């Protein structure tokens, strides 16, 4: 499979049950150089998806042996967890940045909560919300620490000089705007008291009342279910969308994740193009 879409790894893993020998080809010289400086970044490399899948299973399951069915479910869980890192439909959590340690935080939390059990977030058909609660609870306990880590990393990056004399320098400066323009982020400041309130006031333009935060959290749970169905079945509702540019905080989301099986999205009858 060849393509530049960021979610191709998840899509190829999702198709392993029906295609055992999948390889992903991408031109990623910067990535190749970052993992091994002895490799030629201009050579062609392919990612063997079955080997990647087995490595993921071993990591999530703490190396324990499990049934083939459970292995498949572990991969479904991995795909589901990546939704928390953001995609075309959902923004990522400030505590979980895929460019830094977001994936590591997810895998560590999963291994600590579900890795030694036979529980799953999903079996590819159903979301088991009570099991998702276990994962999110672990993450929310470390949320402030993770956000502070990101804050410090961005402080270090912001100290870099970004000249703009040449076109190349101006392009790099443009790409670095999230590091340069940080007024809102610095105002929120996770090291200062009541930063959670400032998070909602600044990024959502709302008063952080319980009712307002609940609406955001429910909409985010809808987003998880909608994206899950979009990946595993079909688009459940062509008119649905996540209404905000940012996610709720994990410490708030945990309060609205159900302990039982339920649905937040009802499948709509309408087609993509209404007649």
Question: Can you name each region flagged by the protein language model?
Answer:
Residues 1-275:
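Long, low-complexity, charge-dense
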């Amino acid at each position: 499979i060849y393509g530049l879409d960021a979610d191709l790894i998840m899509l190829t893993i999702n198709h392993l049950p029906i295609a055992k020998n999948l390889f992903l080809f991408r031109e990623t010289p910067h990535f190749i150089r970052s993992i091994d400086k002895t490799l030629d970044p201009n050579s062609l490399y392919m990612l063997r998806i079955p080997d990647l899948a087995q490595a993921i299973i071993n990591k999530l399951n703490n190396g324990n042996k499990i049934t083939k069915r459970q292995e498949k479910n572990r991969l479904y869980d991995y795909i589901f967890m990546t939704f928390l890192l953001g995609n075309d439909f959902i923004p990522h959590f400030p505590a979980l940045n895929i460019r830094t340690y977001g994936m590591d935080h997810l895998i560590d939390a999963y291994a600590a909560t579900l890795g030694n059990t036979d529980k799953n977030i999903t079996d590819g058909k159903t979301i088991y919300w009570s099991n998702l609660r276990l994962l999110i609870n672990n993450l929310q306990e470390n949320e402030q620490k993770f956000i502070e880590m990101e804050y410090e990393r961005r402080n270090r990056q912001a100290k870099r000089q970004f000249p703009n004399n040449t076109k190349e320098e101006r392009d790099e400066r443009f790409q670095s705007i999230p590091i340069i323009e940080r007024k809102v982020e610095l105002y929120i400041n996770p090291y200062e008291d009541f930063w959670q309130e400032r998070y909602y006031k600044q990024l959502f333009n709302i008063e952080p009342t319980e009712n307002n935060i609940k609406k955001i959290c429910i909409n985010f749970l809808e987003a998880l279910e909608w994206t899950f169905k979009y990946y595993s079945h079909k688009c459940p509702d062509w008119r649905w969308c996540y209404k905000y540019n940012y996610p709720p905080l994990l410490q708030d989301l945990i309060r609205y994740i159900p302990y039982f099986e339920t649905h937040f999205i009802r499948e709509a009858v309408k087609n993509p193009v209404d007649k």
